[in-house]
């Protein structure tokens, strides 16, 4: 039952992120279910934070996940994803407080004030990724946590920029204010298709692409490494 439910979640997120299937093929067979569950769990929480339009609905969903992460920490998980993660000594050693921060950081990411600079914007996603790094270290003891945080932050920033219209509907701005100022475009004008908006997005993609090239790759998780390469390819295609 749990295995079937996990497979359903993997199928769901593979449809949204095709490179996930490739990454899971390289995972050790014994640890593959937990690796898949952790990836899908984080994706579910990011989706609730950044892709549910109504704030109140997003908050209810995130509060539910916060309760479920607390249940996981207490050894009483109910959801198939958290049930799959239970029983691993390294994950079980993660404190309830850390799981709680992993959930609350998602809402903070949604409600962050507009960022002045590219680095300020990246810090928004980095704060979320930092809360999930200990879970990655629990499953990948050799992972470079700082490199994983940087790679995940850039992945989140790219997806948020590509979903610009959706973010604006939530009154969020996934681009730095300095970029709007440089192109002399207001937030309201950003909501309308235009050559100026296309130029802003190309510049943001260029920033992200350069930052991706600087990420240390030797000790990333398999999923982060595969996703990073796929995102670099996406940036190249969109920047043409």
Write out the residue ranges for each language-model feature.
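Catalytic cores of Mg2+-dependent Asp-rich isoprenoid enzymes
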Residues: 1-86, 102, 125-134, 138-240
């Amino acid at each position: 039952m749990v295995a079937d439910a996990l497979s359903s979640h993997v199928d769901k997120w593979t449809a949204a992120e095709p490179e996930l299937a490739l990454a899971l093929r390289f995972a050790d067979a014994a640890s593959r279910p937990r690796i898949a569950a952790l990836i899908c769990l984080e994706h579910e929480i990011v989706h609730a934070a950044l892709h549910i339009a109504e704030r109140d609905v997003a908050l209810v969903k995130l509060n539910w996940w916060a309760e479920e992460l607390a249940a996981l920490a207490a050894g009483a998980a109910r959801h198939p994803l958290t049930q799959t993660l239970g029983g691993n000594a390294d994950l079980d050693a993660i404190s309830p407080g850390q799981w709680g921060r992993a959930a609350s950081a998602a809402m903070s990411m949604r409600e962050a004030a507009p960022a002045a600079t590219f680095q300020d914007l990246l810090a928004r996603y980095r704060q979320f990724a930092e809360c999930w790094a200990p879970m990655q270290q629990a499953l990948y003891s050799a992972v470079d946590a700082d490199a994983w945080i940087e790679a995940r932050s850039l992945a989140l920033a790219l997806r948020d920029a590509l979903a610009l219209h959706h973010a604006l509907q939530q009154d969020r701005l996934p681009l730095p204010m300095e970029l709007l100022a440089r192109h002399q475009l207001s937030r309201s004008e950003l909501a309308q298709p235009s050559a100026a908006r296309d130029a802003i997005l190309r510049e943001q993609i260029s920033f992200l692409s350069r930052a991706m090239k600087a990420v240390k790759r030797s000790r990333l998780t398999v999923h982060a490494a595969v996703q990073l390469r796929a995102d670099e390819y996406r940036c190249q295609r969109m920047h043409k």
